[in-house]
Amino acid sequence: MRRLIGGLLTALVLSGCMVGPDYRKPEIAVPSDFRGATPGAAQDASSFGNVEWWKVFQDEQLQALIRIALEQNYDLRVAATRILQARSQVVIARSFQFPTADLAVAAPYDRQTGGNKTPNYENFFPQGGASVAWELDLWGRFRRATEAARADLLATEDFRRTVILTLISDVARTYFTLRELDLEMEISRSTLATRETFLRLTKAREQGGVATLLDVRQAEQLYFSAAATIADLVRSIEQQENLISILVGKYPEAIPRGRPLTEQALVMAPAVPPGLTSDLLARRPDILQAEQQLVSANARIGEAKALLFPSVVISGFAGAGGAVINGSGFGPFGAFQALPTITLPFFNMGRLSANVDFNDARTQEALLRYQQAIQQAFGEVADSLVGVRQRKAVREQNEATVAAQRDALRLSTMRYEGGVTSFLEVLVTERDLFDAELILAQSWRDEILAIVQLYKALGGGWQTVAPLPAPTATSELPPQDVGPSAAEGRTVPGGDSASVHAGRVSVAEERATNGTGAESGSPAAGGGNDTTWGSVKTFFGRLFSK
């Protein structure tokens, strides 16, 4: 007994060891500033990332659509269920660190009557017991697996934040595209009305002998062209509304409008101060996800290395039983068994070593992907900064173009009315104005979308998350602090899941429902005599009185 206790104490001491590398955050050199950041801007980190960035546009309809999307979008709800799955995986991985216990009860009954050559008999052998098994975590295999599962959970949570950030950006992008199409529709209808007036006047001039039939046909061509543009815009607007409806988790329907596009564009993105690269990129969920995937892969190395060492399993059994033979009770009898088992890997054709190499290579891949995610983030921010700056310049140039084109139309109309030029010059100038106005509308949209992309690239607003769906009884888990390898401030489940008993039907209820009555294996089957059943009750009375 002393040797057994001493062995257990030694095993418990050894269980504090863990093979494999501990995670250390990689030191990655990054630029001190974003390319394209505003030189000399004030250090104000609250400009980005700490606010619900879509509210800077001050469009109540857009904000309402985003709120609905955060509640009903299916991609986001799927991501939330994956978090529940990852939480369960943490509980499963952690459970291997502790002993398992099982209870078993058996009551075999055997009865024979009406025998001619063999004597009649009636036997009942009730027995029950508990078995316990515990694989000691001497080398940290199960703790490494738990560490990896917790990192996977955090990566899943970061993936959900990525979905949130992408969803908000997509809703804003599609909404502003819809408002741009509305602006194009407004321009097209105004142009159609103008061309209708041109056509009517041209027909009147042709009837008066001032204009030619060619002038009429050219005016008709411009009129029908504008009408076709309107028909195509109707299609595009409805398709855009359908896309927004799906994003917010609804069936296709009309989308309410808020502020006009030209008023939206009056809201400019604030200057990006230099020196905020570390703070802002540390909040990008895709970078955090890549790091947690690196943490998980690193922990899997230790899990694989632990398989190279001996494993110790301590199992035991304790129980009691008895017998009732032809009405006579015997027992109860007790039983106890302890069985420590040591398993040492001997020959596996290099499988275990290859498993270590495989996980080491996966860790190297995860490190490269982490570095790549950081580099891509810098590229996206730089692209967004130049996009905001140049889209604004393009929009200003297009405004000047439209102003010049309107004046050109005024002058060409005066020249035509004065008989200096042909009607073709007026039509060409008016057509060029229509095209310039459509291009200006698109430049308004592109400038706003560049602002949206900038906020997305800087990870802005992702911390405003939608609530997880209410977990079921099997997945409602108590939180536990994350180990040192996980991100600070986040929690993962560490307790056992609650079991669900609702909906189960007892054997007696099932038999009553099915109307099957007693069977041959039951003590009540076959009309057993009172002596035997009385002995059974006496046996159980003696058993539970011990």
Region locations from a protein language model:
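C-terminal motif of bacterial Sec signal peptides marking the signal peptidase cleavage site
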Residues: 15-16
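Post-signal peptide N-terminal segment of mature Sec-exported envelope proteins
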Residues: 26-44
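Regulatory alphaC helix of protein kinase catalytic domains
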Residues: 38-68
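Small/polar (Gly/Ser/Thr/Ala-rich) solvent-exposed segments
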Residues: 77, 97-122, 133-162, 181-182, ...
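Amphipathic alpha-helical coiled-coil segments
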Residues: 78-93, 163, 167-190, 194-199, ...
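Hydrophobic, lipid-facing positions within transmembrane beta-strands of outer-membrane proteins
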Residues: 124-132, 174, 276, 336-342
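Short, solvent-exposed, mixed-charge loop/turn linkers that connect secondary-structure elements
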Residues: 190-193, 210-212, 231-281, 422, ...
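Acidic, low-complexity, intrinsically disordered peripheral segments
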Residues: 251-252, 266-268, 438-546
